[in-house]
Amino acid sequence: MRGGRGAPFWLWPLPKLALLPLLWVLFQRTRPQGSAGPLQCYGVGPLGDLNCSWEPLGDLGAPSELHLQSQKYRSNKTQTVAVAAGRSWVAIPREQLTMSDKLLVWGTKAGQPLWPPVFVNLETQMKPNAPRLGPDVDFSEDDPLEATVHWAPPTWPSHKVLICQFHYRRCQEAAWTLLEPELKTIPLTPVEIQDLELATGYKVYGRCRMEKEEDLWGEWSPILSFQTPPSAPKDVWVSGNLCGTPGGEEPLLLWKAPGPCVQVSYKVWFWVGGRELSPEGITCCCSLIPSGAEWARVSAVNATSWEPLTNLSLVCLDSASAPRSVAVSSIAGSTELLVTWQPGPGEPLEHVVDWARDGDPLEKLNWVRLPPGNLSALLPGNFTVGVPYRITVTAVSASGLASASSVWGFREELAPLVGPTLWRLQDAPPGTPAIAWGEVPRHQLRGHLTHYTLCAQSGTSPSVCMNVSGNTQSVTLPDLPWGPCELWVTASTIAGQGPPGPILRLHLPDNTLRWKVLPGILFLWGLFLLGCGLSLATSGRCYHLRHKVLPRWVWEKVPDPANSSSGQPHMEQVPEAQPLGDLPILEVEEMEPPPVMESSQPAQATAPLDSGYEKHFLPTPEELGLLGPPRPQVLA
């Protein structure tokens, strides 16, 4: 049909016998030997099976049958191999093939070819097995370090040459390095790896191919791991209070581990008091420093002969030769810290900057070494915001160490998490409360302290606050009002003010002047009244009044209420009569006594009744001396 689109030639139904002439036509369109395409076939080893694999071709999918036609021995014989559904490869047993044969291979689905056939030469188109590496590895005895890896080629006819290539990499590195040149199996030479580092782990593996098949490489060999000879640590440093005040944590001698892929044993020597000490059981990578040690030396067990020992002087130099003006700052958009300082008066060999997170053990110390001309260091690492890091700069010279005072650095300061704890001190002066507070833990302060804020609240009145210097931790409060009072303190950094600490509750007495003077006035007034009373009681003018006002047992010389004479008949003393004079005569009529009524019963004698009450009366005129002596009576 004119203008119609013709179907592909392999979709037309053809009888089986008609396929043979067509394949000879398609042979002109076969892919070159070894070229990549939908179908690839190769032999595995000199006596292995023939492996064929393919990729699905669009909507046509995978073949259901694979056809192999001999082109060298029986050109008219075609061998068909069934393919399981869903598989993308098939293995043809070696027993079904002829040695050194040349095959034409294609795949069909429902009797229709899916792709052009490929040409396979069984004599050359083979993948060798993987080579065998090690386990012996030899190392050179001088610098630079070289390693010689022994290996064996895969099983192969002795007259046929294989080309093998090897790759190596350092432990924990991602990229592999190709060793040049490629090696041949005839003659067989070992694998040599140059410019290696001591106390380092390496990995190596390889693969082989036939000499004429440049792109048909065999399988990779298993990876061989090996370790170069151990060496003394290059970087040794001190952690802890080596040159500070004795009594703290014991300092440690630290060195950096060679890496997780290497196992090294170490030996340490210290020079103490003119003799050498070598502690046993040294683990990686620290050792306690004995008191008074002057220098330390570290070496690795079974180290190479040309590797020198690592020495470090432990003598503490005067602080005047230490670096000065150490400052720490953060870098915007970076997780690193910048440390700067000014040099001391000496000429150091190098500067060492070490740092550790607050609260970390001595073993977790980091440090970097810098040339003597460097006066700044960019500390690597992922520093956390709000976390304090102790940073120390030390000048290292041949005579010893001179360390500057440690400083605390922050990548970014934050507001404190807690407030200080308050407690009351002894009043100074009495009546004036004094308080003190503790420091906020550094990891909760989260920055450099700028000041404290002290707040007080009495009753329902609003709180009153005042700022206190960060160097002050105790104050007296003379102006607090009397009554109940609450106190609290907050800490502040440049990032802001933190929450208040625990509240201290006080109850203050009234300390105003009137309440201080009134008790004194009352006391003096009481003394005045008491003095007046005593003076009146003891003076002659009022002496006789005590008999009338006070009980007898009070004014008796020896007061004794139990033995008082108040219960006995009282005999009044009458003053003597005055001499007779011209006094008026008073006529007195004598009255007869009333008659006595006799009772039938005799009168009973009654004892005087003592009720305990003493009768006292006002003095009579005679007692007061207001009247003259009585006149004699004149009887009418």
From Swiss-Prot:
Annotated Gene3D superfamilies: Immunoglobulins
TM spans (from-to): 517-537
UniProt xrefs under CDD domains: FN3
Membrane topology, as annotated: Single-pass type I membrane protein
Cited InterPro entries: FN3_dom (IPR003961), FN3_sf (IPR036116), Ig-like_fold (IPR013783), Type1_Cytokine_Rcpt_Type2 (IPR052672)
Signal peptide: 1-32
Subcellular location: Membrane
Functional note: Receptor for IL27. Requires IL6ST/GP130 to mediate signal transduction in response to IL27. This signaling system acts through STAT3 and STAT1. Acts as a receptor for the neuroprotective peptide humanin as part of a complex with IL6ST/GP130 and CNTFR. Involved in the regulation of Th1-type immune responses. Also appears to be involved in innate defense mechanisms.
Family note: Belongs to the type I cytokine receptor family. Type 2 subfamily.
Domain notes: The WSXWS motif appears to be necessary for proper protein folding and thereby efficient intracellular transport and cell-surface receptor binding.
Record-given protein name: Interleukin-27 receptor subunit alpha
